[in-house]
Every structure is written in structure tokens, then in C-alpha cells.
């Protein structure tokens, strides 16, 4: 779950409203589209699926959002803006890097299994397969969204080095990738039905190796 989504290219820009005022709630329609994309993915979601979920006709969809691609890009941003706080709030306020990583993963265990709100399981960004079927710009948008997790982790671990909590010899790049991979794996397991308790146990096992990975050996 992220909240930084760069926009690139024409497909990332929603159409500007023109003509008669809309006869539907655009925000509510976007929320419905986001949920549908989250559950089914971009490729498996058809325009008819979207119009049914959003309660509008296809002309209204195109007038309000421009295209399916532009709607998906906006849905990704909406997803991040609405849901990122579930996993990042405690991370950002944690006093130590260890506490930050633990909070990120534990809060992910709750959020990814729908335990903090009535949300679909898994992470919309992690589970997205868009980009390999002729939608290069959307693929780049998704990759950039995924990169946010790594960048935040690497920055926080770097601060841990500055604070003396993590050894200067520690490979914080590799450690950030490791934590990112753990969280991504949790998303897949959550989508497959793993419980919050199972994911929390996974986090505890992950953190058992913290000292080995962050301190000088010998």
C-alpha cells in the first residue's frame, strides 16, 4: 500500500468534464472501480464489469475518466491515498529502525487480511500484473508505486546506521529488499487465504534474524 503515484503520459490524465453536469457521484464511482480493480486486476476487468460496479454507462465512464487505462491510474492513486496510513503511520513514528520494520510488517498483516477495514485481501499494487500486455505506461506507474516501499525502507535503515542502531557494515540495500520481499509475499499469502495470525507469526520469524543482519559479526 503506497501513497506516492507519479503520473506519466496521456493515459494517466482523466478527461476533463464538459457539457452537462454529471448525474452521478464521481468519487463513489472511483471507489467502486478501485475495489473492482483490486479484486480482479486490470486485465480481467472489462468495461462492462466497471460500468456495472460503478452504476454508470460506458459514455459516462469515458467522459469522466477518459479511458480504462486512465481510470486504473486514478484508481491506483486513490488506493494509495486512502489506504497507505494503515501500514505506514506506525512505521513513520517509530523510534528505532527495528520498531519501524516490525510495525510495517505487523500492520501489513492486519491490513492485508482485511482486519482493519472492510477491504479486499492483499495489496492492489503488489498483486497488479499490468504492464506486460501492451500497457507500458501503466506498468511503469505500478513499478514506481512498488519502489516507494523500498525507498522508504532503505532511508529508514540508513537513519538507523546514522543513529548507531545498525552497523555501518550492514548491507541496508539488501536488507530493504528483503523486507520488501517479505511484505510482498505476505500480500500473496493473504490473497490466498492466510490469516492475520499466520502472517504475524511470519513477521516474528523474520525479525528473529534482525541482529544477525544489522550488527557486526565477530
Where are these regions (language model features)?
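N-terminal intrinsically disordered/low-complexity leader segments
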Residues: 1-24, 214-218
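Hydrophobic alpha-helical segments that form the core
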Residues: 2-5, 107, 121-127, 168-189, ...
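Helix-turn-helix
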Residues: 28, 36-74
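Short hydrophobic clusters on alpha-helical segments that form packing/core surfaces
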Residues: 29-37, 108, 183
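Hydrophobic alpha-helical connector segments
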Residues: 74, 88-121, 172-179
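Short, basic, alpha-helical segments at the C-terminal edge of helix-turn-helix-like DNA-binding modules
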Residues: 77-82
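Amphipathic alpha-helical packing segments from all-alpha helical-bundle domains
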Residues: 84, 99-103, 135-163, 174, ...
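Amphipathic C-terminal alpha-helical segment
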Residues: 111-115, 131-134, 159, 179-197, ...
Amino acid at each position: 500500500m503506497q501513497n506516492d503515484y507519479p503520473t506519466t503520459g496521456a493515459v494517466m490524465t482523466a478527461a476533463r468534464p464538459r457539457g452537462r453536469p454529471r448525474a452521478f457521484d464521481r468519487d463513489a464511482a472511483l471507489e467502486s472501480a478501485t475495489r473492482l480493480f483490486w479484486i480482479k486486476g486490470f486485465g480481467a476487468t472489462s468495461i462492462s464489469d466497471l460500468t456495472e460496479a460503478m452504476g454508470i454507462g460506458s459514455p459516462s465512464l469515458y467522459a469522466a475518466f477518459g479511458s480504462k487505462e486512465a481510470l486504473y491510474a486514478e484508481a491506483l492513486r486513490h488506493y494509495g491515498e486512502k489506504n497507505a496510513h494503515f501500514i505506514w503511520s506506525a512505521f513513520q513514528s517509530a523510534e528505532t529502525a527495528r520498531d519501524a520494520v516490525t510495525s510495517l510488517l505487523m500492520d501489513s498483516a492486519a491490513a492485508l487480511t482485511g482486519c482493519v477495514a472492510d477491504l479486499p485481501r492483499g495489496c492492489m499494487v503488489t498483486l497488479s500484473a499490468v504492464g506486460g500486455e501492451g500497457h507500458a505506461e501503466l506498468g511503469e506507474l505500478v513499478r514506481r508505486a512498488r519502489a516507494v516501499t523500498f525507498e522508504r525502507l532503505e532511508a529508514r535503515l540508513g537513519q538507523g546506521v546514522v543513529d548507531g542502531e545498525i552497523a555501518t557494515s550492514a548491507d541496508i540495500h539488501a536488507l530493504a529488499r528483503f523486507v520488501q520481499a517479505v511484505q510482498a509475499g505476505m500480500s500473496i499469502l493473504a490473497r490466498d487465504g492466510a490469516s492475520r495470525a499466520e502472517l504475524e507469526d511470519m513477521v516474528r520469524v523474520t525479525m528473529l534474524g534482525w541482529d544477525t543482519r544489522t550488527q557486526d559479526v565477530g
